[in-house]
C-alpha cells in the first residue's frame, strides 16, 4: 500500500515536470511564429496610428495571443495543485506527513512500515512453523492410531488364543476329574480286593491251624503204628504155621474193613473238616484194636489191622504233604496280604494327597475361570472398542469380522480335531482297559490287583511330582506378580506425578489467562486515557489547569503502581518463603516472578515515558495548537490502526488459545489412551506369562505321561516274558502306546513352538512398552515446550500490543519531535539507551537464574533442559554433551 503511494507520488512529480517543460516550449514556438507572420505581412492596420499607440496595441495583441495559453497553463497548474492537495490529503490521512517538505517523516513512516512488515513476515513464518509442527503431530497421531488398530488386531488374536487355551484347560480339568473318578473307583476296588484278601487270609490261617493239629495227631499215630509194625513183624514170624486158619478169618472181616475205607474216602471227598473227625475215629479204632489185641491175642486180626494202618499211614503221608504245600501257600498268602495292606495304606495316603492336590487344582481352575472372566470382560471391552471404531471405518470392521470368522472357524476346526483326538484317546483307553481286563482274567486276581496298585502308586507319585512342580511355579508366579505389582505401583506413581504436573500447568494457564485479562483491562484503560488525551488536545488552551490535574492523576497512578509493586514484592517474598516447602514449584514461581518483574519494569517504563511526554507536552503546547487539526486526523488514523491491530492481536490470541486447547485436549486424550494401552499391555503381558507357565506345566505333564507310558511299556514287556499266551495282545497295546507316545511327542513339540512364540510375543510387548514410555516422555517434553512457547508468544504479543501504540504515538508525534529535536535531543537518546541496557540486563539475569537453577537442582534438570536449550539454542548433540559433562 505505502510503496504504491510512494510510486504514485513519484509519477505525479514526473508528469508535472514534463507538463511545465512542454508549456514553455509551446509558448516559445507560438511567439516566434506570430512574430514571423507579422514580419511577413509587412503592413499592419496600425501603421496609420502613432508609434506609441502602435507599440501599445502590439503589446495588447501579444497579451491577447498569450492570454489563452496562460489561461490553459493556469488551469493545468490549478489541476496539478488540486491533485497535489488530494495527494497530501491522502498522505495526511494515511501517514504522519502534513506538508510536502516533511520528507524525513515520510522516510521514518516507510521505515516503520518496513519494520512492521518484517515483524508480520516473522510472525507469519512462526505461525507457518507452528502449523507445520501441528501437521507433524497430526501425522504422528494418525500413525499412533494405526498402531493402536494393529495392537487391537493382535490383542484380538491373543484373546482368541486365550479362549482356545481356556477350552483346553477346561478339557484338561474334565480329564483330571475323570482321572480322579477312575482313581477313586480303583481305590474302592483295591479296598474290596484287600477285604477279600483279608477274609481269605483268615480262612487260610484257620485252615492252617486245623492242619497243624491234624499233622500233630497224625505224627502221634505214626509213632504208634511204627511200634505196632515192630510187634506185628515179630508176631508174623511166630505165627507162620497158622496161616490157613488166619486166611479164613480175614476173608470174613475184609468187607467190614473195606466199608470203613470207603466211608473214610467219602468223608475226605465231601469236606476237609470231617477228615479230622474220621482220623479221630480211626485213632479211636486203633486204640480199641490195641485193646482187643492183648485180649484176643489172635494173629489174623493183628495182620489185618497192620495192613489197615499201613494204608492209613500212606494216606496220612499224602495228606501231610498236601497240608505242607497248603501251609507254604498260606504263608505266601499271608506275606501277600501284609504287602497288600501296606500298599492299601500307602494308596490311601496318596489318595488323600491327591484329593488335596485336586482341591488345589480346582482352586487353580477357579482362578483360571476368573482370568477367563477377565478375558471375557476384555473381549467385551474390545468389542465396544470395535463398535467405536465402526464409526471411523467400516472397511476395517469388515476385515476384523472376516478375521474373527476365520479365527472362529480355525477354533472350531481345532476343537473338532481335539475332540477327535479325545475320542481316539478314549478308544485307546477303552482298548487298553479291555486288554487289561483280559490280562486280569488270564492272570490271578491278586497279581493283577497288585499291578494295578503299583501303577496307581506310580501315577500318584507322578501326579504328586507334577503338583509339587505346579506349586513351585505358582510360588514363582506369585513372586513375579509381586514384582509386576511393584512396577505397576511405581508407574502409577509416575502417572500421578505427571497428572500433578498437568494440574500445575492448568493452574499456570489459568493465571496466564487472568494476566491476559488484566492486560486487556490495562489496554482498555490506556485506550480511555488516549481518548482523554485527544479531548484534552482539542481543548488545550482552556485545559492547562486540567493538565496539571492529569499530572496529579498520573502521580496517583504511579503511587498505585508503586503500591502494586509493593504487593507484588510481598507476593514475591511469600513465594520465596514457600520455596523451602515446595521445591517442585520453584521454577514456576521464578517464571511468574520474572514475568511480574518484567511487567513492573514495563509499567515503570510506561510511567517514565508518560512523564517525559508530559514534560514535552508542557513545552509543545503552543505548537500543538497549530497542529490540532492535523493531530485529529492523525488520532483518527491511529485509532483505526490501533483498533485493527488490537483486533488482529485478539484474533491471534484467540486462535493461539484455541490451538493450545486443541493441543492440550489431544495430548490429554493421547495420554489417557497411552495409559490405557500400557495397562492393557501389562495385563496381556501378565496373561502371557501365566500362559507360558501353564504351557510349561503342560509340557511337564506330558513328559510325566511319556515317562508313565514308558514305565507301562516296560511293565508290559516284563509281563510279556511271563505271560506268553497274551503276547499278541501285548504287542497291540505296545503299538498303541507307541502311537500315543508319538502323538504326545508331537504335542510336546507343538507346545514348545507355541511357548517360543509366546516368548517372542512377550519380548515384542516389552519393546512396545519401552517405545510407549519413550513416546510418553517425548510428548511430555513437547507439551512443556508448547506451553513455554505459548507463554513466550503471549509475552511477545503483550509486549507487541504495548509497544505498537507507543510506536504509533511516536510516528504520530514525529513532526513535533522533529521540531523539538533541536531543543531536546540528548534526553531521548539517553532514555532509549537506558531502556535497552535495562532489557539486556533483565535478559542476562533471567538466563543466569535459569542456568543456576539447572546446575543446582539435579531433580529438575529434565524440566529445565528444554528451557536452557531454547535460551542457548542448543542442538540434541549439545544437550547430550552437556548432560554427560554434568554426570
UniProtKB/Swiss-Prot annotation:
Ranges for domain GRIP: 837-885
Compositionally biased intervals (Low complexity): 788-807
Bias (Polar residues) ranges: 240-254, 808-822
Membrane-protein topology: Peripheral membrane protein
UniProt-listed InterPro entries: Golgi-autophagy_related (IPR051952), GRIP_dom (IPR000237)
Location relative to the cell: Cytoplasm; Golgi apparatus membrane
This protein's record includes keyword Coiled coil: yes
GO biological-process terms attached to the record: Golgi to plasma membrane protein transport; response to endoplasmic reticulum stress
Transmembrane region(s): none
A GO cellular component annotation in the UniProt record: Golgi membrane
Record field: compositional bias (Basic and acidic residues): 37-50, 145-210
Coiled-coil region: 118-241, 299-788
Role description: Involved in vesicular transport between an endosomal compartment and the Golgi apparatus.
Protein name: Golgin IMH1
Organism: Eremothecium gossypii (strain ATCC 10895 / CBS 109.51 / FGSC 9923 / NRRL Y-1056) (Yeast)
Gene this chain is encoded by: IMH1
